[in-house]
Protein backbone atom coordinates (compact mmCIF):
# COMPACT_ATOMS: atom_id res chain seq x y z
CA UNK A 1 0.00 0.00 0.00
CA UNK A 2 1.35 3.41 -1.00
CA UNK A 3 1.78 6.16 1.56
CA UNK A 4 -0.21 9.40 1.44
CA UNK A 5 1.99 12.50 1.17
CA UNK A 6 0.69 15.98 1.94
CA UNK A 7 3.19 18.78 1.32
CA UNK A 8 2.65 22.46 2.06
CA UNK A 9 4.52 24.75 -0.32
CA UNK A 10 4.79 28.18 1.26
CA UNK A 11 6.52 29.75 -1.76
CA UNK A 12 7.70 33.34 -1.10
CA UNK A 13 5.53 33.89 1.95
CA UNK A 14 6.54 34.59 5.54
CA UNK A 15 9.63 35.88 7.27
CA UNK A 16 11.46 33.34 9.40
CA UNK A 17 9.59 34.52 12.49
CA UNK A 18 6.19 34.28 10.80
CA UNK A 19 6.98 30.88 9.32
CA UNK A 20 8.11 29.49 12.67
CA UNK A 21 4.81 30.51 14.30
CA UNK A 22 2.76 28.66 11.67
CA UNK A 23 5.09 25.65 11.69
CA UNK A 24 4.89 25.36 15.47
CA UNK A 25 1.07 25.40 15.38
CA UNK A 26 1.02 22.61 12.79
CA UNK A 27 3.62 20.49 14.58
CA UNK A 28 1.81 20.88 17.91
CA UNK A 29 -1.51 19.71 16.48
CA UNK A 30 -0.17 16.79 14.45
CA UNK A 31 0.80 14.61 17.39
CA UNK A 32 0.12 11.17 15.96
CA UNK A 33 0.14 9.92 12.39
CA UNK A 34 -0.57 6.60 10.76
CA UNK A 35 2.49 4.85 9.37
CA UNK A 36 1.23 5.37 5.83
CA UNK A 37 0.80 9.14 6.19
CA UNK A 38 3.51 11.78 5.68
CA UNK A 39 3.28 15.57 6.14
CA UNK A 40 5.87 18.03 4.86
CA UNK A 41 6.24 21.81 4.83
CA UNK A 42 8.53 23.89 2.63
CA UNK A 43 9.17 27.40 3.94
CA UNK A 44 11.35 29.96 2.13
CA UNK A 45 15.10 29.35 2.35
CA UNK A 46 15.49 32.18 4.87
CA UNK A 47 13.10 30.42 7.27
CA UNK A 48 14.61 26.93 7.10
CA UNK A 49 16.75 27.33 10.20
CA UNK A 50 13.99 28.57 12.52
CA UNK A 51 11.36 26.21 11.15
CA UNK A 52 13.75 23.28 11.51
CA UNK A 53 14.04 24.05 15.22
CA UNK A 54 10.27 24.43 15.61
CA UNK A 55 9.42 21.03 14.13
CA UNK A 56 12.34 19.06 15.58
CA UNK A 57 11.08 15.81 17.09
CA UNK A 58 7.63 16.23 15.50
CA UNK A 59 5.82 14.30 12.77
CA UNK A 60 6.50 17.05 10.21
CA UNK A 61 9.23 16.77 7.58
CA UNK A 62 11.15 19.83 6.41
CA UNK A 63 11.44 20.53 2.70
CA UNK A 64 13.02 23.08 0.37
CA UNK A 65 11.49 24.71 -2.68
CA UNK A 66 14.42 24.33 -5.06
CA UNK A 67 18.10 23.46 -5.26
CA UNK A 68 21.09 23.98 -7.54
CA UNK A 69 22.47 21.10 -9.56
CA UNK A 70 25.95 22.32 -8.61
CA UNK A 71 27.64 21.36 -5.35
CA UNK A 72 29.23 24.82 -5.00
CA UNK A 73 30.68 27.60 -7.12
CA UNK A 74 29.80 30.77 -8.99
CA UNK A 75 26.02 30.52 -8.94
CA UNK A 76 24.76 33.80 -7.47
CA UNK A 77 21.43 33.44 -5.61
CA UNK A 78 21.39 29.62 -5.73
CA UNK A 79 21.57 27.12 -2.88
CA UNK A 80 23.41 23.81 -2.84
CA UNK A 81 22.31 20.38 -1.57
CA UNK A 82 24.78 20.44 1.34
CA UNK A 83 23.49 23.86 2.43
CA UNK A 84 19.95 22.46 2.61
CA UNK A 85 21.03 19.33 4.44
CA UNK A 86 22.73 21.47 7.07
CA UNK A 87 19.30 22.82 8.02
CA UNK A 88 17.78 19.35 8.26
CA UNK A 89 15.97 19.45 4.91
CA UNK A 90 14.64 15.99 4.06
CA UNK A 91 13.01 16.59 0.69
CA UNK A 92 13.23 19.08 -2.18
CA UNK A 93 10.65 20.27 -4.70
CA UNK A 94 12.15 20.36 -8.21
CA UNK A 95 10.67 21.53 -11.50
CA UNK A 96 7.80 23.53 -10.03
CA UNK A 97 5.91 25.32 -12.80
CA UNK A 98 6.79 28.73 -11.33
CA UNK A 99 10.49 27.84 -11.56
CA UNK A 100 10.00 26.68 -15.13
CA UNK A 101 8.14 29.88 -16.01
CA UNK A 102 9.95 32.61 -14.06
CA UNK A 103 13.43 31.13 -13.68
CA UNK A 104 13.65 29.56 -17.13
CA UNK A 105 14.24 26.04 -15.82
CA UNK A 106 14.17 23.49 -18.63
CA UNK A 107 13.58 19.75 -18.45
CA UNK A 108 17.34 19.30 -18.87
CA UNK A 109 18.17 21.59 -15.93
CA UNK A 110 15.55 19.90 -13.77
CA UNK A 111 16.97 16.48 -14.66
CA UNK A 112 20.43 17.65 -13.58
CA UNK A 113 18.95 18.73 -10.24
CA UNK A 114 17.27 15.35 -9.80
CA UNK A 115 20.51 13.49 -10.49
CA UNK A 116 22.47 15.77 -8.15
CA UNK A 117 19.88 15.41 -5.40
CA UNK A 118 20.05 11.62 -5.59
CA UNK A 119 23.74 11.78 -4.68
CA UNK A 120 22.75 13.24 -1.32
CA UNK A 121 20.80 11.72 1.60
CA UNK A 122 17.48 13.48 1.00
CA UNK A 123 14.53 11.23 1.80
CA UNK A 124 12.54 12.42 -1.21
CA UNK A 125 12.81 14.58 -4.30
CA UNK A 126 9.53 15.82 -5.75
CA UNK A 127 9.49 16.13 -9.54
CA UNK A 128 6.72 18.49 -10.68
CA UNK A 129 5.09 18.15 -14.09
CA UNK A 130 2.07 19.81 -15.67
CA UNK A 131 0.50 21.43 -18.70
CA UNK A 132 -0.71 24.94 -19.54
CA UNK A 133 -4.34 25.75 -20.32
CA UNK A 134 -3.50 26.09 -24.03
CA UNK A 135 -1.89 22.65 -24.01
CA UNK A 136 -4.93 21.14 -22.33
CA UNK A 137 -7.32 22.86 -24.73
CA UNK A 138 -5.21 21.53 -27.61
CA UNK A 139 -5.51 18.00 -26.17
CA UNK A 140 -1.75 17.83 -25.60
CA UNK A 141 -1.91 17.21 -21.84
CA UNK A 142 -0.63 13.65 -21.80
CA UNK A 143 2.05 14.30 -24.43
CA UNK A 144 3.40 17.26 -22.47
CA UNK A 145 3.23 15.67 -19.04
CA UNK A 146 4.68 12.30 -20.01
CA UNK A 147 7.50 14.00 -21.90
CA UNK A 148 8.35 15.97 -18.75
CA UNK A 149 8.31 12.72 -16.76
CA UNK A 150 10.66 10.96 -19.17
CA UNK A 151 13.10 13.87 -19.40
CA UNK A 152 13.02 14.53 -15.68
CA UNK A 153 13.82 10.91 -14.85
CA UNK A 154 16.46 10.41 -17.52
CA UNK A 155 19.36 8.52 -15.95
CA UNK A 156 17.48 7.72 -12.73
CA UNK A 157 18.01 4.07 -11.81
CA UNK A 158 15.33 1.67 -10.61
CA UNK A 159 16.93 1.62 -7.17
CA UNK A 160 16.79 5.44 -6.95
CA UNK A 161 13.26 5.92 -8.27
CA UNK A 162 11.88 4.97 -4.83
CA UNK A 163 13.18 8.33 -3.58
CA UNK A 164 11.27 10.23 -6.26
CA UNK A 165 7.76 11.57 -5.74
CA UNK A 166 5.95 12.82 -8.83
CA UNK A 167 3.60 15.78 -8.54
CA UNK A 168 1.09 16.52 -11.28
CA UNK A 169 0.28 20.22 -11.12
CA UNK A 170 -1.80 21.52 -14.02
CA UNK A 171 -0.45 25.04 -14.46
CA UNK A 172 -3.90 26.46 -15.19
CA UNK A 173 -5.07 25.33 -11.72
CA UNK A 174 -2.23 26.78 -9.62
CA UNK A 175 -3.34 29.73 -7.54
CA UNK A 176 -6.35 30.32 -9.78
CA UNK A 177 -9.05 28.72 -7.69
CA UNK A 178 -9.64 26.32 -10.57
CA UNK A 179 -9.10 22.66 -9.80
CA UNK A 180 -8.94 19.71 -12.14
CA UNK A 181 -11.93 17.47 -11.59
CA UNK A 182 -11.14 14.22 -9.85
CA UNK A 183 -11.65 12.48 -13.20
CA UNK A 184 -9.25 14.83 -15.03
CA UNK A 185 -6.62 14.44 -12.33
CA UNK A 186 -6.99 10.66 -12.15
CA UNK A 187 -6.64 10.33 -15.93
CA UNK A 188 -3.23 12.03 -15.85
CA UNK A 189 -2.08 10.23 -12.70
CA UNK A 190 -3.00 6.88 -14.24
CA UNK A 191 -1.10 7.77 -17.43
CA UNK A 192 1.96 8.77 -15.39
CA UNK A 193 1.84 5.47 -13.51
CA UNK A 194 1.64 3.54 -16.77
CA UNK A 195 4.59 5.53 -18.12
CA UNK A 196 6.62 4.64 -15.03
CA UNK A 197 5.80 0.98 -15.67
CA UNK A 198 7.16 1.32 -19.22
CA UNK A 199 10.30 3.10 -18.02
CA UNK A 200 10.95 0.78 -15.06
CA UNK A 201 8.66 -2.07 -13.98
CA UNK A 202 5.17 -2.80 -12.69
CA UNK A 203 6.56 -3.10 -9.17
CA UNK A 204 8.01 0.41 -9.40
CA UNK A 205 4.83 1.88 -10.89
CA UNK A 206 2.71 0.21 -8.20
CA UNK A 207 4.78 1.87 -5.49
CA UNK A 208 5.66 5.30 -6.90
CA UNK A 209 3.95 8.20 -5.13
CA UNK A 210 2.06 10.67 -7.36
CA UNK A 211 0.73 13.85 -5.76
CA UNK A 212 -1.79 16.30 -7.18
CA UNK A 213 -1.21 20.04 -6.95
CA UNK A 214 -3.50 22.86 -8.04
CA UNK A 215 -5.83 24.82 -5.74
CA UNK A 216 -6.20 21.91 -3.31
CA UNK A 217 -8.28 22.80 -0.25
CA UNK A 218 -10.25 21.16 2.55
CA UNK A 219 -13.36 20.97 0.36
CA UNK A 220 -11.87 19.03 -2.55
CA UNK A 221 -8.96 17.09 -1.05
CA UNK A 222 -10.99 14.08 0.10
CA UNK A 223 -12.53 13.31 -3.27
CA UNK A 224 -9.16 13.73 -4.99
CA UNK A 225 -7.46 11.38 -2.51
CA UNK A 226 -10.17 8.77 -3.08
CA UNK A 227 -9.00 8.28 -6.66
CA UNK A 228 -6.87 5.11 -7.03
CA UNK A 229 -3.78 6.76 -8.53
CA UNK A 230 -3.67 9.97 -6.45
CA UNK A 231 -1.43 9.51 -3.42
CA UNK A 232 -1.29 12.95 -1.89
CA UNK A 233 -1.27 16.65 -2.56
CA UNK A 234 1.18 19.49 -3.09
CA UNK A 235 -0.67 22.36 -1.44
CA UNK A 236 0.02 26.05 -1.92
CA UNK A 237 -2.26 28.77 -0.58
CA UNK A 238 -4.32 26.49 1.64
CA UNK A 239 -1.18 25.46 3.55
CA UNK A 240 -0.24 29.01 4.56
CA UNK A 241 -2.59 29.11 7.54
CA UNK A 242 -2.21 26.42 10.17
CA UNK A 243 -5.99 26.11 10.48
CA UNK A 244 -6.63 25.47 6.78
CA UNK A 245 -3.69 23.08 6.42
CA UNK A 246 -4.78 21.14 9.50
CA UNK A 247 -8.32 20.99 8.10
CA UNK A 248 -6.95 19.38 4.94
CA UNK A 249 -4.92 16.91 6.99
CA UNK A 250 -7.92 15.97 9.13
CA UNK A 251 -10.12 15.49 6.07
CA UNK A 252 -7.67 12.95 4.67
CA UNK A 253 -6.74 11.11 7.87
Curated annotation (Swiss-Prot):
InterPro entries per UniProt: Aldolase_TIM, TIM_sf, TrioseP_Isoase_bac/euk, Triosephosphate_isomerase, Triosephosphate_isomerase_AS
GO terms, biological process: gluconeogenesis; glyceraldehyde-3-phosphate biosynthetic process; glycerol catabolic process; glycolytic process
Keywords recorded for this protein, A-Z: Cytoplasm, Gluconeogenesis, Glycolysis, Isomerase
GO molecular function terms listed in the Swiss-Prot or TrEMBL record: triose-phosphate isomerase activity
Pathway the protein contributes to: Carbohydrate biosynthesis; gluconeogenesis; Carbohydrate degradation; glycolysis; D-glyceraldehyde 3-phosphate from glycerone phosphate: step 1/1
Chief location category: cytoplasm
EC numbers on record: 5.3.1.1
Compartments it resides in: Cytoplasm
Leading EC class: isomerase
Binding site for substrate: 9-11, 175, 215, 236-237
Active site (UniProt): 96, 169
Alphabetical list of Gene3D superfamilies matching this protein: Aldolase class I
Superkingdom, taxonomy of origin: Bacteria
Catalytic activity: D-glyceraldehyde 3-phosphate = dihydroxyacetone phosphate
One cellular component (GO) term of this entry: cytosol
Subunit: Homodimer.
HAMAP family linked to this entry: TIM_B
Role description: Involved in the gluconeogenesis. Catalyzes stereospecifically the conversion of dihydroxyacetone phosphate (DHAP) to D-glyceraldehyde-3-phosphate (G3P).
Family named by the database record: Belongs to the triosephosphate isomerase family.
Protein name: Triosephosphate isomerase
Naturally occurring in which organism (per UniProt): Borrelia garinii subsp. bavariensis (strain ATCC BAA-2496 / DSM 23469 / PBi)
Taxonomic lineage of the native organism: Bacteria, Pseudomonadati, Spirochaetota, Spirochaetia, Spirochaetales
UniProt gene name: tpiA
